[in-house]
């Protein structure tokens, strides 16, 4: 029997131990599993309390069972659910009983969702939305993923595809029956008007979703600077926990430390890097190299100033175009909080150039950190752009729709040069949008997507 024809089961709730655990079974033998273990199949969509027994008649647990007859189920197949007490012993006994039934096996990661997709219960964009929802860290990410799961992009793409097929049919009819006089001479005009409108809609969707993938992937902020400038202290202050070791000795941080923050709903990865300086220590040299690389690839760099070190940021991380803020730390020690320090004085240091933002803080005491966080939040508002309300949430979506819009534009440009050429470009656009929805040529995408799901989903 092919694996996709076998019945699958998995824990669909949290890790044990727990008060309640939900074990889901999907496939042709789901009803058999209920009969063998629960004694009977309950009324559809009705919870029933039963004593579960293994195939030798030994009691497993006092539990609740439910039955969802396919295709009116989450996967489109027959589905059974066992709601048991969430101890490892109970679950192991239930798993052993299920495994002893012919053609029933443990599920692979994402296999329930893959079966739902293959049975037409969800499209590929909705499956991607579910993946994003499972991995959402912030409320803004959750809301974006939920809209995707509810079909925001899928519904729009299906309508585009339907209208393109209608327009293509008109043009194909004009090609097939032009010599028979069955089709009006102006058949091409309404079809191409529809094509032009759909192209504009796709382009407007792309424009309205500019940089929308950013909310899903998050922003990276690197804390860089010379040794002992207080980078780890600032990381801990922003993370509100002891994520990095703090020491008065220079060179304590030798590797890159990452902390994930929820900044007013925006996902931000904060990176603490090794102090950048010239050193003969090979381990510290590797840390400095990694620090430079991560700072150069970050979306924003916070450079902690050190008045005792003349090394400027442009001398250490290069001119990569990464936004850079200068943060003067240890104002409680240097006296900058009361000496009336002029921000322009800092801009004039050799090799530093004109820097857009300056902040004076004490990472150890917290002075000025609230202002820095407020500035980071404001920066995030602009950096994430339309991500929260975007229709497009993945680079895959963007690439496909850009190609579809290009094909439609090419179809418009080919008017008068042969209806066959126009029709072919429209067919390409139809196939592309079908690929967006998961209708054609997407096995490689499915394997990658569902591999990232947890077992039981």
Curated annotation (Swiss-Prot):
InterPro entries: G_TrmE (IPR031168), GTP-bd (IPR006073), GTP-bd_TrmE_N (IPR018948), GTPase_MnmE (IPR004520), MnmE_dom2 (IPR027368), MnmE_helical (IPR025867), P-loop_NTPase (IPR027417), Small_GTP-bd (IPR005225). GO terms for biological process: tRNA methylation; tRNA wobble uridine modification. CDD domains: trmE, TrmE_N. It is found in: Cytoplasm. Residues 218-381 form the TrmE-type G domain. Binds 1 potassium ion per subunit. The keyword Amino-acid biosynthesis does not apply. Mg(2+) binds at residues 232, 253. It is an enzyme of class 3 (hydrolase). Exhibits a very high intrinsic GTPase hydrolysis rate. Involved in the addition of a carboxymethylaminomethyl (cmnm) group at the wobble position (U34) of certain tRNAs, forming tRNA-cmnm(5)s(2)U34. NCBIfam families: mnmE_trmE_thdF, PRK05291.1-3, small_GTP. This is tRNA modification GTPase MnmE.
